[in-house]
């Protein structure tokens, strides 16, 4: 696990989604950037350690979701909200398992990364918007309230 919780500061549970078909390097890069930006802004965060999943800490499987839920439960008194970031399509079942099993009852924000028009080959394609639709649909089905970003990604 990696925890950078800061007493007296808002702390977020972070979920970085990925899916086997897509390039997990995109997820690794977004994870690094998101953690750095939260630290710069003075926020704390709780996220699976890079060694805990096959994709360097990104959420891909149901088992990853179980690990994440356990981690979030351990830090439930420090987590003020959950940020789900989708660098690519993401695997919604792992993400939903993490949030539902953690039972934190905190705000959930879902964000997806844009595709770049000149980078839609197999190594660079994100298709995160479609993943966001799937994740949000599952959150809705599970009765988990969430906030969507103003723009589609």
Language model regions located:
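An N-terminal assembly and electron-transfer interface module characteristic of large anaerobic redox
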Residues: 1-153
